[in-house]
Amino acid sequence: MAWFDGPVHIPRALTSVGRTKTPFHRWVYAPARFRRLIGLYPPLLGAGVRVSHISDDWTAGTVTVRVHPWTANLHGSAFGGALFSATDVLYGMMLAAQLGRRFEVWTKAASIEFHAPGTGTLTLQV
């Protein structure tokens, strides 16, 4: 959560996209609705990713990743792509909701450091 501490610098080119949001975009900015809707998104559903909690002010969230045979690597631990997809969806939406509807958030670059193999059900708290 280090990059949420303190002010967030947003380059001028990323500030406003000038698009009118659809009613769907306005509807999805409620944390409970987003949590239920993202649970039905096929890539995350197949990867075993589930958003289990998002705070009302979008400052905290919990994601679980269940390791299935189709999401495990040759050693039986969680495939790194499934772990990264769990973090990307939550961080991106939390930042977008905090910045407001006039902004779009895109993951331009990211890195992940694995400390130990993940097996069973993994929990990410942001």
Task: List each model region and its residues.
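Hydrophobic beta-strand core residues of beta-sandwich domains
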Residues: 54, 78, 116-118
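Residue-level signal for pocket-adjacent positions within structured domains
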Residues: 39, 46, 69, 73, ...
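Generic structural "secondary-structure junction" signal
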Residues: 40, 46-47, 76, 85, ...
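Generic "edge-of-domain/loop-turn" microfeature
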Residues: 56, 70-72, 119
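Beta-strand secondary-structure signal
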Residues: 50, 60-64, 111, 123-125
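Non-catalytic linker/capping segments at the edges of enzyme domains
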Residues: 1-62
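Hydrophobic beta-strand-centered segment that forms part of the acyl-chain substrate-binding groove
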Residues: 93-125
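Hot-dog-fold acyl-thioester-processing enzymes
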Residues: 66-91
